[in-house]
Structure formats: C-alpha cells, structure tokens
Amino acid sequence: MHPAAEHSPLGKSSEYIATYTPSLLFPIPRTAKWAELGLTAETLPYKGVDFWNCFELSWLLPSGKPVVAIGEFSIPADSPNIIESKSFKLYLNSLNQTPFADTASLEATLVKDLSAAAGKPVGVRVRSLKDVEAEGVVALPGVCIDDLDISVSDYEHPRPELLRCDDSRVVEESVHSHLLKSNCPVTSQPDWGSVVVEYRGAALDHASLLEYIVSFRQHSDFHEQCVERIFLDLQRLLKPEKLTVFARYVRRGGLDINPYRSTESVQLPNHRLVRQ
C-alpha cells in the first residue's frame, strides 16, 4: 500500500458532508509509485492524462433548485499528486447543498480546488445529461484479443516475462482487451477495466499480451500505476517508434478513472464504453 493512502478516507467510515468543503480532497504523491517503476518526475518516458468522469454531480441554483450533471476531469499524468478516489467523491458530494450562480462558477471552483490538490492545472467540463446521452457508447479501436486460447495459472503479480514479439517484423496496430482486472491496494475491492495498446514496433504476440494482461488479476495497485507498468513493460520489449496504452475502468462510487499514457500527444477522446 502507498504509505500516504493509509491516512486517506479510503476503506474507512466517513461522514458525508453536503456543503462545500474543499479540504476533503486527499492528494497522494506519485513519487513513491514512480520510484517502484524506476522513474522520477524528470525521467517520465510518456505523456498522458488521467480522465475522470463523475456521474453523481449535483449542486443548487441560487433559487434552491437542484441541478444534476456529469463532470469530466483531466489530470496531467506528470502532476505531483493523484487524488484519492473516495476523497474525490466526498468532495463532490459536498457540493450537493451548495448554491452556485451558474455552471461557469461551479467549473471555476472545481478547477481551483482540483488543481491545488493535483499540483498542476486540471481540466474540467460540466456537461448536461442530454449532451452525454446523445454520444452513447463506443467500441474500442483495433482488434479484440479476448477470444484467443490461452492457459493461465498465476494471477498474483504482473508477469512481463510472458510477453513475446517478433523482432524481424515491424508493424503498426491497435489491439484491446476487456479482461484487465486488478485490486485496490487499500480496500482489495476489484477494479475492472478495458485496455488498448497502440504501437509501431516489433510485432507483438497477441496471445502473450493477453496472458500478461490476465496476470494483473490479483495484483494490488492504483489504476494509474497499472497502466504505467503496462506501458513500461511493452516499451522495454518492443522498443517502439510510438506507443500508447489507455485503460477505461468501470466506475465505482459514481466515478470512473481512465489513465492514458503515450509517447505521442493525447489524442483519444473521452468516450464511454458499454461497461461505463
């Protein structure tokens, strides 16, 4: 477990405060998890962002009438801190009985508070249910590898040694799997996700990639670090000209977390999958 997470509200009984309380936000430094992967803030081999979507966003108009909306937040992958998810939920709940003059005022407050917690500017969009409903759900790009026939017996830790490639062939492709699962390092609750790998480099053996993804099944780590580990393991193996790893996780507590790590600029839109 991350030492800072021990002091977070995650896994503990919490009072649900319904009036604006920005102090509820609990930042967790990324440095310890970066160090586990041999990284520092100065040596990150990727660009990226963590997309968060909130489906339980509500506040009051000056008249006292409630409003509901969907919040979209983008936290830079190189920000000093992640925001612990339960504290994020508690903070958003504290808006429920708080009046705001208009949506712009709410967005400005969210930008201020979330940027202070993350240690870097956070993008915020407050969207109407109608707008999000019109977008529907999308399918992941590329080839789904989930129907490949594999045998698996070890689920405790990620196993990069399973990954194989053909160095004699250079390909550019996009593949995805819906079989990503890991566990919360604090509560041990399951985190279910789908992951996309897009790259140009040595041809990756798809069955070995699926075996590797399944090896995360009992691994305990935060969403962000799972994606970073996948990115680094693939980068070491493939030595690619370009590489993107993007995961979309099933929501918990009204929030879903979708980390994106890439050698390229962030391009993928924040569109929901069928499990989101």
Swiss-Prot record:
- Ligand binding (NADPH): S85, K86, R252, G253
Location within or outside the cell:
Cytoplasm
User: What biological-process GO terms show up in the record?
Assistant: queuosine biosynthetic process; tRNA modification
Under catalytic activity, the entry for this protein gives:
7-aminomethyl-7-carbaguanine + 2 NADP(+) = 7-cyano-7-deazaguanine + 2 NADPH + 3 H(+)
Q: Does the keyword ATP-binding apply?
A: no
Q: Could you say which EC number(s) this protein's record lists?
A: 1.7.1.13
**Known function:** Catalyzes the NADPH-dependent reduction of 7-cyano-7-deazaguanine (preQ0) to 7-aminomethyl-7-deazaguanine (preQ1).
Q: What Pfam families does its record include? A: QueF, QueF_N
Gene Ontology molecular function: any one: preQ1 synthase activity
What subunit structure does UniProt give?
Homodimer.
Mind telling me what this protein is named? NADPH-dependent 7-cyano-7-deazaguanine reductase
Task: Please tell me where substrate binds in this chain.
Answer: I83, E84, S85, H223, E224
Write down the Gene3D superfamilies for this protein, in alphabetical order: 3.30.1130.10
Pathway field of the UniProt record reads: tRNA modification; tRNA-queuosine biosynthesis
State the HAMAP family in the record: QueF_type2 (MF_00817)
According to the UniProt record, one GO cellular component term is: cytoplasm
Q: Which domain of life is it from?
A: Bacteria
Q: Which UniProt keywords apply?
A: Cytoplasm, NADP, Oxidoreductase, Queuosine biosynthesis
Catalytic residues at: C184 (thioimide intermediate), D191 (proton donor)
Which gene carries the instructions for this protein?
queF
Q: To which protein family does this belong?
A: Belongs to the GTP cyclohydrolase I family. QueF type 2 subfamily.
